[in-house]
Curated annotation (Swiss-Prot):
Protein name according to UniProt: Thymidylate synthase
Family: Belongs to the thymidylate synthase family.
InterPro entries, per the entry: Thymidate_synth/dCMP_Mease, Thymidate_synth/dCMP_Mease_dom, Thymidate_synth/dCMP_Mease_sf, Thymidylate_synthase, Thymidylate_synthase_AS
Top enzyme class: transferase
Amino acid sequence: MSTHTEEQHGEHQYLSQVQHILNYGSFKNDRTGTGTLSIFGTQSRFSLENEFPLLTTKRVFWRGVVEELLWFIRGSTDSKELSAAGVHIWDANGSRSFLDKLGFYDRDEGDLGPVYGFQWRHFGAEYKGVGRDYKGEGVDQLKQLIDTIKTNPTDRRMLMCAWNVSDIPKMVLPPCHVLSQFYVCDGKLSCQLYQRSADMGLGVPFNIASYSLLTCMIAHVTNLVPGEFIHTIGDAHIYVDHIDALKMQLTRTPRPFPTLRFARNVSCIDDFKADDIILENYNPHPIIKMHMAV
């Protein structure tokens, strides 16, 4: 059960940001040709102590959040792995037509380039395509992060970065969520994410859940408890074809956030399976369909 009253509910931060962009956002043309309303610089904070911030004013694709995060953790850059799990959020970016449009004619369909998972687990390694074993190559930022949390929790350098300038030309899409920093205090693990670009309608509900889940998973393997997730955004935008859907979402009243638990004790981040991650008491409003701009 959520500890928030209606006025204090964490979801109101998201809804207020959406309303602010609708009211005051500047129209900008964008890479996709869709057009956006945009503002620069937002921040929200979500408690992870007694609840899990999966938005309730529409149903969020939870299984997609879980499978994508596990895919990142594996270091995978193959969208076909996600497709095989029934998660198709990267299909368009890995399609033959999209790869050819970017000039990646020799790249296999589904090969996204050195995107998030590769940077998390093999930062600095030379990317040579999917299906290659990169074990021991580059810097395993995720492992280093977890080791530091365990051995030196007061360190102020507990960062994980997906923005590798030399690799960006090889990626189908430069990272949107670029930098996360972790912080330990009083036995609680918190995370702050800096996101350079945020699709408020489709992306942000997913991003909040994904990094909150990552924080809970890292807390579990380091014998800490989850503290807080702080979400800092640069270009926060609403695609113009999402405006009506978001106006509908704004009419809905947030419901209590769900809770998260793990089905078993897991000591290594790589050992988590989808079945280990259990979401309870999620009772959202119905899904609201929005088109993904590519």
